[in-house]
Amino acid sequence: MDDHLLTAAEVADELRVSTMTIYRLIRSGELAAVRVGRNYRVRSSDLERYLSSQVVDPDSVDLSAMDDA
């Protein structure tokens, strides 16, 4: 089985976001997940699919609104 299952915490660590953010993405349907008992698991292929859908076209981003922090 090449498509391994990740916990919400593992996905959060990978994306450098909070676990709550991952749960919000799952509940909104933006990130596909499977339910195992009372817990959610994210297939590695679904995480890749989500990340591919989030790619930003640099020509469409207004960088003047960003801070120089």
Segments the model singles out, each with a brief description of its role:
Residues 15-39:
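Major-groove DNA-recognition helix of helix-turn-helix-type DNA-binding domains
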Residues 1-24, 44-69:
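Basic Lys/Arg-rich amphipathic helical interaction modules
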